[in-house]
From Swiss-Prot:
UniProt biased composition (Basic and acidic residues): 517-543
One GO BP annotation of this record: beta-glucan biosynthetic process
Protein name: Glucans biosynthesis protein G
Function: Involved in the biosynthesis of osmoregulated periplasmic glucans (OPGs).
Organism: Pseudomonas entomophila (strain L48)
Chain coiled-coil ranges: none
Annotated HAMAP family: MdoG_OpgG
Biased composition (Low complexity): 544-554
Biological or metabolic pathway of the protein: Glycan metabolism; osmoregulated periplasmic glucan (OPG) biosynthesis
UniProt GO cellular component terms: outer membrane-bounded periplasmic space
Length: 578
C-alpha cells in the first residue's frame, strides 16, 4: 500500500529525531563496510574498463639526475626505516618504499585500505636519505614511488626484515625464515622468447589492506596493464619458515597473443656441476636455481637440470592439469657454492601449486645465454593450450611456496635427483691410465627414503632413452653407499655437436604381483557347490574299477612380476655446440 503524505501517521518529534540519527548511523556503517569490503571485484572492474580502452604507456616524470644515474648512485638513496608506513602502529607488518631511479623511471600508485577509507600513500622525499645525490625536494614533491617492500619480524622478534619486494614490471620476490633473495615471480608473461619480442605487463597500481595487530597475513591487490593485457590480482602473503603467497588473478586480453605465460618464474643459472664454468672459478656452482621440477597431472615427477646455453633454448613439457611445478635450488651446503658474500645455498626454491584444473597445456622452460650472474636468464611458466578470447576474463589461482626445504616438495614414495655431474668421457686402459674416448659422461645420483631402505644388492635397473642425436656407449648403475642411493653413469657419443641432445632416465625394479584374495562364497554359491560335489561323487562311483583317475597338472612357472618406478624422471638437454 502506498501511503499518502496527508494520511501518514504522525510521529512525535523525539522519536523522529532518534529514527533519523539511527538512519544516519546505519548509512555510516554501510559505507564503512563497503570500503572495508574492497576486494578483487573492485580491481577487476578497473581492469575490464582499461581493457576496453586504448593502451597508454606510462609517462616518466623523473628528472635526468635520477634517470641517468648509475647503480652505485641509486644505492646511495636510502629509505629511513623509522619512517616506514605503520611504523608507529602495532601491526607486525610495515611498508618501506623504493625511490625512482635508473630504469625504474615510472611511478606506481600505492593505496592503503583501512576500515573506513581507501587513500593513496603519497610520495614524501623526507622518507629518504639521498647522500651526495643532488636533488630538488620542491621539484620532486609529486614524484611517486617506484615500488615497495614488505617488512616483518621473520628472523627475530625485535627486527623488521624484508620479506617481499615489488619493483619493476610485475616482478616480486619473497623470502622465508633464514632465506636470501633469489629468484623472482611475475604476474604475467606474454610472447616470451618469440622473435616478435616479449611484452612485459606491469603492475601500475596497488591497494594494501592495513593489517590488524595480530594478523599473520597481508593482503595486496594489484592492477596489471600492458599493450595487450589488463588484469586484477590478489596476493595474500603468509610469512613463515616457508613463506606462501596465494594468488588470485582475473585477466583480460586487449589483443591476441601468441604465447601466454601463467605463474611465470624468473631466475639465474650461470654454471654448475652439470655444466662447469668455462673459465677457472673457485666456485663449484653459481646459480639462483638449478633445475625445473614438474609434478604432472598423471602423477609423474620430472626433473630438468638447467643450462646456460650458447643459443636461446626453449623446452615445452606437455602436461594436463599440472599438480605443481617450480624452479628449485636443491644443493644446500656452503661447499656447493663457496661464496661468503652471495650465499647461494640460502636462496629459496619456488614451487607453484595450481588451484583447480588448468586443463591441457605445457610447462615451458626458457634458457637464455648470459656471460655473468647479473642477468636473469631462466624463465619457467604454464602455457595453456587454448588461448583466451580477447575481452573475456580468464582466471588462474595458485599458491607460491618459497622454501629451502626441498624434501617437502618430493613424493615420499619416489627418489629424486640429488645431483647431475658432467665430465669428459673416458676409458681405463690396461696400464690403468684413463684416456678420453670422444664421449660425454653424465653421473646422476638418485636418493630418497624409499631407496635408502633397499639393500645394496637390490636388483634396481635404469630405464634410459636418448634422442636420435646420440648413441649410448655406457649405461652403468651402481649402489652409492655415501648417499644410500644409486648412481647412474651414462656415456654418450654425440652425432652432431651443433644440435641439442635430449636424454631421459629413471630407476625401476621388478616386484611380485600380489594375488587377489578369494572372495567369500555366498549361501547360493555354497549350495550349488555342494550339489555339484554330490553329483561328481555319484559319477565316480559308477566308473569301472580298472579305470584310473586322472593326475592333477603340476606348475613350475615363476611368480608374475610388475615394474615399479622408484624415482622421478631425469630429463636433460645437452646444449648445442658443447
Amino acid at each position: 500500500m502506498i501511503v499518502s503524505p496527508c494520511i501518514a501517521p504522525r510521529i512525535p518529534g523525539t522519536r523522529l529525531r532518534k529514527a533519523m540519527l539511527a538512519g544516519v548511523a546505519l548509512v555510516g556503517l554501510l559505507s564503512a563496510g563497503q570500503l572495508w569490503a574492497f576486494n578483487l571485484d573492485d580491481v577487476a572492474a578497473k581492469a575490464k574498463d582499461l581493457a576496453g580502452q586504448k593502451y597508454e604507456a606510462p609517462k616518466s616524470n623523473l628528472p635526468p639526475v635520477f634517470r641517468d644515474m648509475k647503480y652505485a648512485d641509486y644505492q646511495k638513496i636510502r629509505f629511513l626505516q623509522e619512517k616506514a608506513e605503520w611504523a608507529k602502529d602495532k601491526t607486525p607488518f610495515k611498508l618501506s618504499f623504493y625511490h625512482q631511479g635508473m630504469h625504474f623511471d615510472t611511478p606506481v600508485t600505492i593505496n592503503e585500505i583501512t576500515a573506513n577509507k581507501v587513500e593513496e600513500i603519497k610520495y614524501d622525499p623526507s622518507r629518504f636519505e639521498f647522500g651526495d645525490v643532488p636533488h630538488d625536494a620542491d621539484a620532486t614533491k609529486n614524484l611517486g614511488y617506484a615500488g615497495f617492500r614488505v617488512l616483518y619480524p621473520i628472523n627475530k622478534a625485535d627486527k623488521q626484515d624484508e620479506i617481499m619486494t615489488l619493483l619493476g614490471a610485475s616482478y616480486f620476490r619473497v623470502v622465508g625464515k633464514g632465506h636470501r633473495y633469489g629468484l623472482s615471480a611475475r604476474g604475467l608473461a606474454i610472447d616470451t622468447a618469440l622473435p616478435s619480442g616479449e611484452e612485459f605487463p606491469r603492475f601500475r597500481e596497488f591497494w594494501i589492506e592495513k593489517p590488524k595487530p595480530k594478523d599473520k597475513h597481508l593482503v595486496i591487490y594489484a592492477l596489471l596493464d600492458s599493450p595487450r593485457s589488463t588484469g586484477a590480482y590478489k596476493l595474500t602473503l603468509r610469512p613463515g619458515e616457508d613463506t606462501l603467497v596465494d594468488v588470485k588473478s582475473r585477466v583480460y586480453l586487449r589483443d591476441n597473443v601468441s604465447r601466454l605465460g601463467i605463474a611465470p618464474l624468473t631466475s639465474m643459472y650461470l654454471f654448475g656441476p652439470n655444466q662447469p664454468s668455462k673459465v677457472m672459478n673457485y666456485r663449484p656452482a653459481l646459480h639462483d636455481s638449478e633445475g625445473l621440477s614438474i609434478h604432472a597431472g598423471n602423477g609423474e615427477w620430472l626433473w630438468r637440470p638447467l643450462n646456460n646455453p650458447k643459443h636461446l633454448a626453449v623446452s615445452n613439457f606437455s602436461v594436463e592439469n599440472p599438480r605443481g611445478f617450480g624452479l628449485l635450488q636443491r644443493q644446500r651446503d656452503f661447499s656447493d657454492y663457496e661464496d661468503l658474500d652471495d650465499e647461494y645455498e640460502k636462496r629459496p626454491s619456488t614451487w607453484i601449486e595450481p588451484k583447480g584444473d588448468w586443463g591441457k597445456g605445457t610447462v615451458d622452460l626458457v634458457e637464455i645465454p648470459t656471460a655473468d650472474e647479473t642477468n636473469d636468464n631462466i624463465v619457467a611458466f604454464w602455457s595453456p593450450e587454448k588461448l583466451p578470447e580477447v575481452g573475456k576474463p580468464f582466471e588462474y589461482d595458485y599458491r607460491l611456496r618459497w622454501t629451502i626445504k626441498e624434501d617437502q616438495l618430493h613424493s615420499p614414495e619416489l627418489g629424486w635427483v640429488k645431483q647431475t655431474l658432467r665430465s669428459t668421457g673416458d676409458v681405463k686402459q690396461s696400464n690403468l691410465i684413463r684416456q678420453a674416448d670422444g664421449t660425454v659422461a653424465f653421473l646422476v645420483d638418485f636418493i630418497g627414503p624409499n631407496l635408502a631402505t633397499l639393500p645394496a644388492d637390490t636388483a634396481v635397473r635404469s630405464q634410459v632413452s636418448v634422442g636420435d642425436n646420440a648413441e649410448v656407449v655406457e649405461n652403468n648403475l651402481r649402489y652409492n653407499p655415501e648417499t644410500k642411493g644409486w648412481r647412474l653413469t651414462l656415456r654418450l657419443k654425440v652425432q652432431d655437436p651443433k644440435k641439442a641432445t635430449e636424454m631421459r632416465a629413471a630407476l625401476l625394479r621388478d616386484v611380485p604381483v600380489e594375488a587377489p584374495k578369494p572372495a567369500k562364497d555366498s549361501k547360493q554359491d555354497k549350495a550349488a557347490a555342494k550339489h555339484a560335489h554330490a553329483k561328481a561323487e555319484k559319477a565316480k562311483a559308477e566308473q569301472p574299477a580298472e579305470q584310473p583317475a586322472a593326475d592333477a597338472a603340476s606348475t613350475n612357472g615363476t611368480p608374475a612380476t610388475t615394474e615399479k618406478v622408484l624415482t622421478e624422471t631425469w630429463s636433460y638437454q645437452l646444449p648445442a655446440d658443447e
